[in-house]
């Protein structure tokens, strides 16, 4: 049962081949057996899962149906879950039980999804390797000595190891797409505002977006259907109708214009990855797509702009964790200032502290114009480059990452080296565009992803292109040895 996709599970439940309770028990046993190898979960919710599965089976018995009804999933541990620890991978929130469900959690629960647990992540979603979690690093099921990507590494590793068919994740600078690439999954970052951020603990509010991680585009369509939609509780949520993503997976790629930015294939890209990306392009050409070279001239400025804007927003968002209202509080503070300093110093890890410092510096009186304002101007240029490109093409294609997954600890002492791994993904966050990563092959036994970007609210187009590609390739069906 553990090898089934979400779509296969939906068919199996509808045909009464097994019950949601049976499936849930099977996967919980598998998690208990295998997760100690990869450390993908922070919290397991066995009792909740079994009660939700039982309720889903009863709903089916009463004639209800639905692709997510009785389907097991997990949530990245920054989505608030009522009465269940929501840690954000941090000592700071190790004791925090949210008083309410995030909109994404509530919507999926209403659709009948079964929550198996909360997945590990880089602390406060800051990282590209899932090594900054207070609960320990997550290991890549394809090679346990390598990182799974971050910050949604727990969700990615759990799905890749077949512990469950799909999971929620978030993407601020590539945190869905990069782990998807590193673990041979399909991951989608929706348009900014497509999925509610209410109850999703913020890292950088103008960049964060929730989305699905699964093995196939078909499964991403099912999970996104349950996550997307307008939410009046989120002031950045956009009131745009949500199409039927699964029904849209049947479109022909004949005449589809795919833009390939020349900047993507400059120095820094592993030549073996470049070859796999070119193979993907040939496959899409066979399906009728037309390839056109384009330019994104301001892409080279994206990383410095992102690493000013994101930490600046983080320094503001994380100021609420002060040892007073909720979260970690130091012992025996001498006075209020000591309480603040020690609670934050002891509660936050080194990467989070680094980004808070960078952000506070960029926002300080003497440097605001030089850094933050300039970064926002670059953000506008990056967005304009995409608008120009999408006048000529329907989709933009390139690598998801410049390199395959690196070894655990390999970039820990050099944060800038890790930041540079985000070069292909952060532009979509700066511009607010939807982006998808799908499996494209392997380098030294490690998975490689190809990234697709589309205009605003064209998630359906991304999913259809990925689905047609997956009907004609088998990379996404490969399973890591031992899982």
UniProtKB/Swiss-Prot annotation:
Transmembrane segments: none
Covalent S-S links between cysteines: none
Residue positions of the active site: 76, 151, 175
Family: Belongs to the amidase family. GatA subfamily.
Gene Ontology terms, MF aspect: ATP binding; glutaminyl-tRNA synthase (glutamine-hydrolyzing) activity
Entry annotated with the keyword Cell inner membrane: no
Stated name of the protein: Glutamyl-tRNA(Gln) amidotransferase subunit A
EC number: 6.3.5.7
Gene Ontology CC annotations of this record: glutamyl-tRNA(Gln) amidotransferase complex
Uppermost EC category: ligase
Chain's role: Allows the formation of correctly charged Gln-tRNA(Gln) through the transamidation of misacylated Glu-tRNA(Gln) in organisms which lack glutaminyl-tRNA synthetase. The reaction takes place in the presence of glutamine and ATP through an activated gamma-phospho-Glu-tRNA(Gln).
Catalytic activity: L-glutamyl-tRNA(Gln) + L-glutamine + ATP + H2O = L-glutaminyl-tRNA(Gln) + L-glutamate + ADP + phosphate + H(+)
Self-association and partners: Heterotrimer of A, B and C subunits.
The UniProt record lists the keyword ATP-binding: yes
Alphabetically ordered keywords of this record: ATP-binding, Ligase, Nucleotide-binding, Protein biosynthesis
The gene coding this protein: gatA
GO biological process: translation
Any one Pfam family match given in the protein's UniProt record, by short name: Amidase
PROSITE patterns: AMIDASES
């Amino acid at each position: 049962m553990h090898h089934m996709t979400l779509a296969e599970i939906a068919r199996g439940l509808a045909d009464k081949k097994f019950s949601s309770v049976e499936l849930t028990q099977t996967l919980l046993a598998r998690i208990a057996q295998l997760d100690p190898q990869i450390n993908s979960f922070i919290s397991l919710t066995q009792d909740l899962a079994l009660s939700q599965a039982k309720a889903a089976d009863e709903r089916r018995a009463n004639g209800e149906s639905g692709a997510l009804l009785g389907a097991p999933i997990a949530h990245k541990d920054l989505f608030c879950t009522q009465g269940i620890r929501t840690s954000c991978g941090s000592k700071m929130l190790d004791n925090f039980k949210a008083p309410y469900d995030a909109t994404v959690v509530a919507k999926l629960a209403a659709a009948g999804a079964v929550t198996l647990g909360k997945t590990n992540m880089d602390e406060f979603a800051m990282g590209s390797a899932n090594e900054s979690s207070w609960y320990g690093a997550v290991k890549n099921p394809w090679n346990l000595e390598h990182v799974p990507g971050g910050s949604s590494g727990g969700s990615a590793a759990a799905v890749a190891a077949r512990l469950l068919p799909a999971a929620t994740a978030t993407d601020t600078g590539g945190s869905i797409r990069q782990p998807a690439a590193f673990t041979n999954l399909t991951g989608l970052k929706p348009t900014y505002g497509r999925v509610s951020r209410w109850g999703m603990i913020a890292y950088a509010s103008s960049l964060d977006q929730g989305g699905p991680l699964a093995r196939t585009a078909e499964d991403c369509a099912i999970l996104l259907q349950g996550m997307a939609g307008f939410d009046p509780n989120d002031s950045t949520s956009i009131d745009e109708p949500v199409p039927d993503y699964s029904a849209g997976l049947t479109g022909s790629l004949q005449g589809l214009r795919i833009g390939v930015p020349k900047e993507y294939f400059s120095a820094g890209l592993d030549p073996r990855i470049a070859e796999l990306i070119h193979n993907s392009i040939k496959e899409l050409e066979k399906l009728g797509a037309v390839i056109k070279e384009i330019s994104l001239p301001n892409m080279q400025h994206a990383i410095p702009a992102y690493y000013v804007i994101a930490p600046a927003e983080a320094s503001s968002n994380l100021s609420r964790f002060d040892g007073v209202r909720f979260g970690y509080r130091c012992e025996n503070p001498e006075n209020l200032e000591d309480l603040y300093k020690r609670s934050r110093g002891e509660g936050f890890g080194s990467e989070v502290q680094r980004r808070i410092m960078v952000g506070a510096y960029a926002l300080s009186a003497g440097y605001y114009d030089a850094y933050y304002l300039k970064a926002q101007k670059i953000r506008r240029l990056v967005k304009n480059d995409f608008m120009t490109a999408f006048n000529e093409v329907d989709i933009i294609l390139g690598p998801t990452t410049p390199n395959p997954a690196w070894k655990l600890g390999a970039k820990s002492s050099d944060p800038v080296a890790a930041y540079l791994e985000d070069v292909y993904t952060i532009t979509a966050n700066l511009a607010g565009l939807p982006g998808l990563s799908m499996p494209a092959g392997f380098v030294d036994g490690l998975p490689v992803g190809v990234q697709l970007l589309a205009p605003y609210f064209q998630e359906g187009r991304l999913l259809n292109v990925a689905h047609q590609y997956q009907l004609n390739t088998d990379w996404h069906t490969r399973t890591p040895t031992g899982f």
